[in-house]
Amino acid sequence: MSIENKNTGVKKVVLAYSGGLDTSAIIPWLKENYDNCEIIAFCADVGQGEEELVGLTEKALASGASECHIVDLKEEFVKDYIYPTMATGAIYEGTYLLGTSMARPIIAKAQVEVARKVGADALCHGCTGKGNDQVRFEGCFAALAPDLKVIAPWREWTMQSREDLLDYLAERNIKTSASATKIYSRDANAFHISHEGGELEDPWNEPSKGVWTLTADPEDAPNQPEYVSLEVENGRVTKVNGEALTPYAALMKLNAIAAPHGVGRIDITENRLVGMKSRGCYETPGGTVMFAALRAIEELVLDKTSRTWREQVGAQMAHLVYDGRWFTPLCKSLLAASESLAESVNGEVVVKLYKGHAIAVKKRSPNSLYSEAFATFGEDQVYDQKHAEGFIRLYSLASRIRALNAK
């Protein structure tokens, strides 16, 4: 179960700790394989739920950690990571709003800060050697703390299954509430929850009702729609139904409103960073409503070239976030450029929630470029349709010349 003790020199390790089976086993494993080093457990509160944090410190200490630091990152996560990313229009492979991906850089940053605070010389995570998260965490560590050693137990130990981990803990009389019958791998934060594994590994299987935990089944959702108003300033949601709220509070309120209507469910097969495809079911109720509202205002205020540019930035940003490149010059540049464009993204949107759908049905903005006087199909006094003839001749000039040359 262990490796040969070639790992000398590490004295203090900060472990990204969740209290789950993997990280519970990592604590004693580190002590056995890294010269009985001191383990500092670190848990990032990114809105995964209070129930996930209850008893966490006691569990970490019982497993062999000397300290447990639980850091509240909820407000910072929404304000400095979710809101800026959404302002770029980032959406991975046309579907995924990057709920897990956005959480990784803030967790990694906070883990490094704890390491500096306690004087650690190593960082440790419980990501598997098959997934994206190992790359995301270690990419952030490289940018923020290249001097610290990184330990990835799943790439070192010989344990391969949940049964192996349970046996390992039992041999050491370390109690755990985990079982070998866990079906799904889940990851939750304030923005979303992801579900992988179980029957989802076969793309021919429809997700069972037991997969979903945050949103109502759209088929069972209310038969009457609900309307929610969002006010946006500089590309950020500032009010929900007229109530001024902090970013985190706004997201929580929208989660509570949209989830009963089954809003925000997706079932995708995505291209992982490490080369393989994986299937995941994601629930993002409040974020889906926010995204719809931002898109609606952008339709009013961005001209054609600005909208095209924003879509290009969004596509690039989605890959940067998904691939763990938050702390890079390009990501910083895209965020800064999007801030400038977002200065005009102001207004109010009413979103209709009904059986899994979130549709913007009303929108207005003081910066709107839409003019009913110009757009009307009826009689108007501001647009001379004869002017279109000259524009069309110039617009199609290259095509005309090409056709003449072909004769």
Swiss-Prot record:
Residues annotated to bind L-citrulline: 96, 101, 132, 136, 185, 194, 270, 282
Cellular localization per UniProt: Cytoplasm
UniProt binding sites for ATP: 16-24, 44, 126
A single Gene Ontology CC term: cytoplasm
Keywords linked to the UniProt accession: Amino-acid biosynthesis, Arginine biosynthesis, ATP-binding, Cytoplasm, Ligase, Nucleotide-binding
One BP annotation, GO: L-arginine biosynthetic process
Catalytic reaction annotation: L-citrulline + L-aspartate + ATP = 2-(N(omega)-L-arginino)succinate + AMP + diphosphate + H(+)
UniProt EC number: 6.3.4.5
Residues the record lists as binding L-aspartate: 128, 132-133
UniProt keyword Amino-acid biosynthesis, yes or no: yes
One term of GO molecular function: ATP binding
Pfam families named in the record: Arginosuc_syn_C, Arginosuc_synth
Gene3D superfamilies reported in the protein's UniProt record: Argininosuccinate synthetase, chain A, domain 2, HUPs, Single helix bin
The protein's annotated pathway: Amino-acid biosynthesis; L-arginine biosynthesis; L-arginine from L-ornithine and carbamoyl phosphate: step 2/3
HAMAP family, sorted: Arg_succ_synth_type1
Subunit structure: Homotetramer.
UniProt cross-references to PANTHER family, sorted A to Z: ARGININOSUCCINATE SYNTHASE
Similarity comment text for this entry: Belongs to the argininosuccinate synthase family. Type 1 subfamily.
Protein name as annotated: Argininosuccinate synthase
